[in-house]
């Protein structure tokens, strides 16, 4: 660019253009996604420069080629295609730097960092490329879908979710302000419904979440094992990992402590500042939603470019019927193994549960972190004798706490066998951005931090269960228990009933079948799966998915005799190819 600025037209043609054509083009390299979009943007510059300074129309062929590349980048890629899943996926999330584990590429969710760069380049191109050089109508339609169906669910109250930023989480506070710019450019290309969604996005990016219509309910991004749910007064994002996906990466000296990101991490927000700048002071062994052994002076594993960030099992994924969203996984990581973990979200509540947690091999305490966020105001908590207490600073560990209030959320603690021991902590923590990013500031940052953790005894069948509700007060009616685990052997089925529908994660179908027969229930799945069933009179609306992404069908027993022998089965055909893992909805009648 410096050469282009200072050279004459003839010198440009002789020196700059040949150099640019050789080093930055869309036809001689194997770039994908955002990296390919960068090359296309530079090719637009040098092709126009060459044409204007030489008068040779042949250079416009390179301009058209760059436009074709940008159009192609708007289209979903195949997970097992030549891009190895890097770019826009069929669920309209964006992947980049997918990590190779053996012979399989594991998807890395990167909508907020590389994805933002990709969309910036495409939108810039769409603005300047006109007439015969315009992006195709199909490309612009798909670009609208990427913004509306993808990006729009990943931001709330002017902030972007940590999960979608990869190693860029170590650079600063992720904002979603750029979405408004894209939405404004795309409005002329959108149909009526998407115009309404884009206008809602423009309003939301300035922090106004007061009147969401389109962005109400949930989305499950099946390619990346990722949940986004926007309730009436809050938003939750959760990430699972499997043999198909990773939770992030380190690289170039960035994000060396991100090993547990995606391992059940769950972030809650209602005003957007819950995690404002917390990264340098975080205890990275206590990320919200994770169940982790607390190892002193922990040596962080190598996670360069996603290595070791993949999950341990096929079972990871979820289901959404629009109003309710569920994400589950089985995970073994370090000495904490075979944990069944689930997040279930409705309009006014998030329920999180874990069972079957094997900690027999650990050397140090194991905790499930309910939350670790910026402390705002005192913490109030309720003991089992219904006495209210306040913790302004310090740490409290007890086994008689039933609910905790902090910064607009009530955390209700349930239990399966015995009441859990929990630790509430409010204290200042210090760190530096350079601790998590080689290019970060070395100056010490000190912030007040609230954390709530559940302790696990050493053994083979650990568990936890809690719900979180947006609330203005500790005793604001948010304490009704909503989560129930029907224990079959090792609690292999997680169930929540919200008054209208039942949300279920079935990890072991055989134990579920035995429990259903013993309990006299006539409806149960015949294989591990996740589903939401809503009954209205004699009709049941069933939304289901296969988290292993290996099955062609799901079978459900909907009627059995008194001995539990199946009489009527429902077989649901599942999507295949790049759609595998997507939810399917069917309706059936019951007697």
Predicted regions located by residue number:
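C-terminal beta-strand-rich structural cap/linker in extracellular carbohydrate-active enzymes
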Residues: 223, 402, 462-467, 575-591
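Alpha-helix capping and helix-coil boundary motifs
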Residues: 54-65, 471-476, 577-581
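Extended polysaccharide-engagement surfaces of secreted carbohydrate-active enzymes
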Residues: 118, 125-564
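Generic low-polarity alpha-helical segments
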Residues: 1-4, 43, 122, 495-497, ...
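Aromatic-lined, polymer-binding surfaces characteristic
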Residues: 1-175
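Surface-exposed loop/edge segments in extracytoplasmic proteins
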Residues: 564-570
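Preference for bulky hydrophobic residues occupying beta-strand positions
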Residues: 542, 556, 572, 586-588
């Amino acid at each position: 660019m410096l050469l282009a600025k200072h050279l004459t037209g003839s010198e440009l043609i002789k020196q700059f253009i040949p150099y640019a054509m050789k080093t930055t083009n869309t036809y001689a390299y194997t770039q994908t996604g955002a990296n390919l979009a960068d090359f296309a943007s530079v090719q637009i510059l040098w092709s126009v420069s060459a044409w204007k300074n030489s008068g040779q129309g042949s250079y416009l062929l390179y301009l058209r080629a760059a436009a074709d590349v940008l159009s192609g980048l708007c289209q979903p890629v195949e997970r097992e295609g030549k891009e190895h899943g890097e770019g826009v996926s069929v669920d309209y999330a964006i992947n980049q730097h997918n990590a190779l584990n053996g012979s399989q590429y594991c998807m890395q969710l990167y909508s907020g960092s590389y994805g933002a760069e990709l969309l910036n380049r495409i939108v810039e191109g769409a603005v300047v490329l006109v007439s015969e050089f315009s992006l195709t109508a199909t490309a612009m339609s798909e670009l609208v879908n990427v913004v509306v169906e993808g990006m729009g669910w990943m931001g709330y109250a002017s902030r972007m979710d940590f999960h979608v930023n990869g190693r860029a989480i170590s650079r600063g506070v992720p904002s979603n302000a750029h979405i408004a710019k894209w939405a404004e450019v795309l409005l002329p290309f959108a149909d009526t419904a998407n115009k309404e969604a884009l206008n809602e996005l423009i309003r939301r990016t300035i922090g106004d979440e007061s009147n969401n219509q389109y962005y109400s309910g949930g989305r499950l991004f099946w390619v990346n094992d990722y949940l986004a749910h926007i309730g009436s007064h809050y938003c939750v994002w959760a990430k699972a990992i499997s043999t198909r996906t990773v939770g992030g990466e380190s690289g170039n000296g960035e994000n060396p402590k991100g090993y547990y990101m995606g391992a059940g991490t769950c972030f809650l927000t209602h005003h957007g500042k819950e995690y404002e700048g917390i990264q340098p002071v975080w205890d990275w062994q206590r990320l919200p939603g994770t169940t982790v052994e607390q190892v002193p002076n922990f040596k962080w594993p190598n996670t360069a470019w996603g290595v070791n960030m993949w999950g341990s099992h096929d079972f990871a994924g979820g289901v959404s019927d629009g109003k309710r969203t569920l994400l589950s996984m089985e995970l073994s990581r370090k000495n904490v193994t075979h944990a069944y973990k689930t997040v279930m979200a409705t309009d006014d509540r998030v329920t999180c549960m874990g069972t079957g947690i094997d900690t027999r091999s650990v050397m140090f305490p194991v905790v499930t972190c309910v939350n670790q966020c910026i402390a705002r105001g005192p913490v109030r908590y309720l003991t089992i004798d219904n006495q209210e207490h306040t913790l302004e600073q310090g740490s409290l560990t007890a086994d008689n706490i039933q609910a905790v209030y902090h910064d607009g959320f009530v955390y209700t603690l349930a239990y399966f066998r015995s009441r859990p021991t929990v630790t509430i902590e409010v204290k200042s923590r210090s760190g530096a951005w350079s601790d998590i990013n080689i290019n970060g500031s070395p100056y010490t940052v000190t912030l007040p931090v609230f954390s709530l953790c559940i302790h696990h005894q050493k053994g083979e069948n650990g568990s936890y269960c809690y719900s979180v509700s947006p609330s203005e007060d500790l005793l604001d009616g948010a304490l009704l228990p909503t989560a129930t685990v029907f224990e079959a052997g090792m609690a292999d089925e997680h169930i929540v009933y919200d008054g209208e529908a039942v949300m279920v994660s079935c990890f072991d179908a055989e134990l579920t079948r035995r429990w259903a027969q013993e309990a006299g229930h006539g409806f149960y799945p015949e294989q591990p799966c996740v589903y939401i069933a809503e009954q209205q009179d004699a009709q049941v609306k069933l939304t289901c998915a296969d988290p292993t992404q290996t099955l062609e069908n799901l079978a459900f027993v909907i009627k059995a005799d008194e001995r539990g022998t199946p009489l009527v089965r429902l077989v649901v055909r599942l999507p295949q190819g790049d759609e595998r893992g997507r939810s399917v909805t069917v309706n059936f009648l019951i007697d």
